[in-house]
Amino acid sequence: MESGRGSSTPPGPIAALGMPDTGPGSSSLGKLQALPVGPRAHCGDPVSLAAAGDGSPDIGPTGELSGSLKIPNRDSGIDSPSSSVAGENFPCEEGLEAGPSPTVLGAHAEMALDSQVPKVTPQEEADSDVGEEPDSENTPQKADKDAGLAQHSGPQKLLHIAQELLHTEETYVKRLHLLDQVFCTRLTDAGIPPEVIMGIFSNISSIHRFHGQFLLPELKTRITEEWDTNPRLGDILQKLAPFLKMYGEYVKNFDRAVGLVSTWTQRSPLFKDVVHSIQKQEVCGNLTLQHHMLEPVQRVPRYELLLKDYLKRLPQDAPDRKDAERSLELISTAANHSNAAIRKVEKMHKLLEVYEQLGGEEDIVNPANELIKEGQIQKLSAKNGTPQDRHLFLFNSMILYCVPKLRLMGQKFSVREKMDISGLQVQDIVKPNTAHTFIITGRKRSLELQTRTEEEKKEWIQIIQATIEKHKQNSETFKAFGGAFSQDEDPSLSPDMPITSTSPVEPVVTTEGSSGAAGLEPRKLSSKTRRDKEKQSCKSCGETFNSITKRRHHCKLCGAVICGKCSEFKAENSRQSRVCRDCFLTQPVAPESTEKTPTADPQPSLLCGPLRLSESGETWSEVWAAIPMSDPQVLHLQGGSQDGRLPRTIPLPSCKLSVPDPEERLDSGHVWKLQWAKQSWYLSASSAELQQQWLETLSTAAHGDTAQDSPGALQLQVPMGAAAP
């Protein structure tokens, strides 16, 4: 908004939030100018100007702003308590806006900045926090001050930018205090469930402590006390910028948080009363809770804009040049980290959409699943070659071959075939009478498919082949450890892995001992029926297995399927050396040789090793855990078939890491908990030292750092009632 048109805008209740000092860094060009007060505040109406002059809004008998005086929150797209209609047009704005007011879409920080804030210079944008005192923003003296600033020397311009950074940081810390110590504390004291509080405010306490106890004191000391002798900003920002990656967790949770606020405001009178009572206070500036929750989403991009402006005015030979450039790089990385978190949420939303389109036929909503490509395709009939309309969903672990349903609402596709990526092959074919065809070959079925164009066919082939290759690389991570934890897996997954019951041959003991260290010789099985029957009953006693009282085990020498009673012959202090009666009598058991110990990882890892896994804290299973160096934000878990969902991949940035309360009395010691949305996993290490090592590595990886460049892991979440470490 032009400075001349907004000269009569009073501080009003908005200035009470920030309470900034007047001075060169107190401008608020971005958001305050988009807050029209009164129905004709910007039209030069004498009545509205007189009302704006005394700064006292029209207050109704209930303490709410009257209907004739609406203050829309034009920055966030979320109306204030007094606004009755979202995106309502006000008088004298028809000529300024071509449509309804734009709204912010949840966690999209860039969209919020681009669509809501007027196009201003980076320096003005960095100082556009709502709630700052509009002391001289639109006065005639503003033009004189800008003209005088243009004549200032380079060092004075840098000082002005530094003062703007300090001023906006002070205001921002007050916002964080309002969210953390006012809203969050009052709602907690009112008895709102802790999971709702955590869902709304996420890690706002950590963000508040970082800015209030570290970044703001450093900036204040440097700019107000040391600037004459040490005029630098880059070294401070470079040291603390990596911690800005914690914004990724807050940003990805923003959509859910806003939804929780709306839901609980509608359904809980207590929640509504507490929130509205705070919003009426002067410290809140008559702005909604949702508006204040938006501030952290927009903060990191503003650091980036301000630092770019600082670098433009910084001489090339300045001592702070190198540190400032490195700081900009780190802050840009933090912004990208937030954007990556947003993309993860969008991927999960896409999985939910596909799940609804399939009518819930396949359980695809899993943090390890990723939808890579989907599209309409034609399947050529095996009988007469007639093309039939089909739909393909390509995930990172499977392909869903679906048939369209002629419905306007509800389920749109029915799953005809599910093909695992493991063992899948794709091949381009050339047929004289049919163009643009290729074949997908799985373990159970082959599909001859046709696309509309040659480019579309090449795209499908390339992306399917790339998905297969990536899946193979991930599987290689655990190939060296498969023998130690394999239970009953598909033989085609690893045809030449160490001896297990899944091999297409049944190993038996030989007297010469010429086959390997254990003296084993493969013997062909008679039929698939026999193999299936042997897997269902114990080799020694013949009793049928079940998941409760008769669990299956495998002999570590011959690989036979046996029950626990018939596999009590094991080496001392070696739970992994279960063997059957025959092997115990014929072969000496050496734990060092029979228990496979992983010695080398084909792909280097930040940390790997055996752990125990449980989803309920009661039943535990052995797994091999690894955080690969190539993808340090993912935890891979490899285990046996008794846990049907293993192996699995857990995205660490989407998880919450915590140490269980001692009162839970879990069956295993040295336990920690990983939680994603409504799913949780308990992991247990063999020692306290190993537990601490995993906690540090997981905490560091969850915030986007690696072991080499991490400035230190962030504090873990401490369960309520437990003392902080």
Curated annotation (Swiss-Prot):
The modification Phosphoserine is found at residue 128. Residues 370-469, 604-703 form the PH domain. Residues 500-512 have a biased composition (Low complexity). Pfam families: FYVE (PF01363), PH (PF00169), RhoGEF (PF00621). A zinc finger (FYVE-type) spans 532-588. Zn(2+) 1 binds at residues 538, 541, 563, 566. This is FYVE, RhoGEF and PH domain-containing protein 3. The lineage of its organism: Eukaryota, Metazoa, Chordata, Craniata, Vertebrata.
